[in-house]
Regions:
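Intrinsically disordered, low-complexity glycine/proline-rich and charged
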Residues: 1-5, 196-201
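Short coil-to-helix leader/linker segments, especially the first N-terminal amphipathic alpha-helix
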Residues: 2-16
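Short acidic/polar alpha-helix capping motifs at helix-coil junctions
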Residues: 3-4, 28, 153
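Short low-complexity stretches enriched in small and charged residues
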Residues: 9-10, 38-41, 73-77, 114-118, ...
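Catalytic NTP-binding/metal-coordinating core of nucleotidyl cyclase/transferase enzymes
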Residues: 14-102
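Catalytic beta-strand-to-alpha-helix segment of the class III nucleotidyl cyclase homology domain
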Residues: 63, 67, 83-200
Length: 201
């Protein structure tokens, strides 16, 4: 490869980096993933139509509760899962508690178990924004993958947090009464090492 070709590659690479930086910005956010546990079993038990109706009600409920948080934003919905971001870890926990309390009440009312598992993590990510609205269009980076892995470890009706949002939210919510939440308990599972992540969470 001659020097001229190398120079052209370098120029192209620099232009790609500049274009990426023009469309993206780095930011520290509280990341939240949630999905319905055993959604396939739900479809097998009640049939596709009833399961789809339940999932639609679930999605409407998620968006209704999210509307109570001015600093929360839906990034993506896929199937029965949501990717949401918040400015504060405490808001992510409040949102999660309200969602699960509503799901418990709904499941008891209709006799159809629909439970979420939720993962929360804080990290610096690359934010792609809508040019007109100034809202996040998509998020990229290792921290997004890490949050998804935290969520994947959860069980039905469980909220899992990595260390920083756990400590931050627990302190911020200390002594605060949450509507519809009788008792709030925090359980420290200790550090957990995930595949592909250097430091334990």
């Amino acid at each position: 490869m001659v020097a001229g070709e190398l120079q052209q590659i370098a120029i192209k690479r620099r232009a790609e980096v500049e274009e990426f930086q023009r469309k993206h910005r780095a930011g520290l956010l509280t990341l939240l993933f949630t999905d319905i546990v055993d959604s396939a079993k739900l479809k097998q038990t009640f049939g596709d139509r009833e399961a789809v109706i339940a999932i639609q009600h679930h999605h409407a409920m998620i968006r209704e509760i999210l509307g109570q948080f001015s600093e929360g934003e839906e990034i993506e919905t896929a199937g029965d899962s949501f990717f949401i971001v918040f400015t504060k870890p405490s808001d992510a926990v409040k949102f999660s508690l309200l969602v699960q309390a509503r799901l418990r009440a709904l499941s008891a009312e209709v006799g159809r178990p629909v439970f979420d598992r939720i993962g929360i993590h804080v990290g610096e990510v690359w934010i792609e924004e809508h040019e007109s609205a100034g809202k996040a269009q998509d998020l990229y980076g290792l921290q997004v993958d890490t949050c998804a892995r935290v969520q994947s470890l959860g069980q039905a009706d469980q909220i899992l947090l990595s260390r920083f949002p756990f400590d931050s939210a627990r302190q911020a919510l200390k002594g605060e009464e949450l509507p519809g939440i009788e008792a709030l308990s925090w359980l420290n599972h200790g550090p957990y090492r995930m595949k592909g992540v250097e430091e334990p969470l």
